[in-house]
Amino acid sequence: MIANNIQDALIQPEAEINAAPTKISGITRKITTYLRWLGSILIILSAVSFMLQGNAEILPAYRYWIGLGLTLLLCAGGLICAYLFHETKGARIFFGLGAAFLSVQVSQVAAMIYAYVQGTNASQPDYSWLQFSQVSPALIGIDLVITGLLLFLVSYASYSILARKHLKTLLWTSVIANALLILPIRDENIVPFIIAGLYFFIRKTECFLHNDASMRLAEGVAARAIISLPLWIMIGRSLLHPASFLLAVVISVILVIYCIYDLKRYTRSTFILYIAQWIGTLSAIAIWIAILAEFVSPRHLGFSSFLPIAVILFALSTQVDYHARLYRFISTLITLGLCYFALTEQQAMAPVVSIAVGILLTIAGIKYREKAPFIGGNICVAAGFLFYWEYAINLYTSAPWISSIALGLAVILLASYIENREKKIIAKSRIYFNELKSWH
């Protein structure tokens, strides 16, 4: 009932404003926009300052209640804008900030529960202002109930005014994300899987919401950003504890997906996409380097260990917006170098891998009409077959007369083939080289 009244109060003034005969001038609109931005920034900075400054002497329970009071104050500001001023923009901002601050409240309750459950075994951050120990179970229970109630009411009101069409989806996603955030788990081998699962769950919801044009407006983007806050809080909280291999890999995967794939949905800025592309590329390479450092001893590292880097660059070349040819060129050079060292050191399966990789590079060169992968692929294929030249020599020395007869027959047949199809061979050779010249 309370949530429905809030929702009606927030939606009703919009119709009244649309029916009003007066029009807001452009200058006034700009001034009010700047003022709203300024006020929002001041509120956020004030809350961050309270959490980061020298407030270690404040008991954890009091710190939670101060944060709760700030959340309620923001909701009160939203009600004032809706009921008293009959204005919805300010109400959206206030309730949006209130819903965002609730994730901070959830994280504080989660810290209390974790400290109580784990006791002296709790892995506390080095910063005293992030430690929430020595809180009574009764108070933790009260905080949990209050937080859960406000999470539903404030989120309901916030998403109703920001994106009423997708209210159920946003509310359901927010509840699940915050429920995972409150779990009293800090194990370095479990938390990365929780982060990965939550990320893909939110990403799936985000892709669904992005398909709706109304969710690309400022209100829709704000609602989508709010539901992802628990994920970023969980990642930031995990970075305050001892790092682990799994966490590094999960964060790197998230960076790759976001920078290479997802960011294109939000902006077309050349500068932002360019920087994000290199961040994503370096993150993808870092994943493989982390795997090598974790599972492979430096003494057992071979040149073949770096072949996946060439594969990563080639795969990313199909997704990046800039320097795709450069990615494929570098990948080709790495592949050529690795095949050369593998063949010269006579590693097992080196010729087979060289031929297989060469065929793939040749096909890629034909597909993208690029000389570097095409020529590099031909070299790899030729090098792979030449590796077996030793067996041909051994065969010749063991039975020279058989090899000589076979070679003589092949030479005569080749001469006859060239003589009968001389013009076709010359014409096709010209077409081949002219086509190759036109490639990049």
Question: Over which residues does each language-model region extend?
Answer:
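Alpha-helical multi-pass membrane segments and their bilayer interfacial helix-loop junctions
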Residues: M1-H440
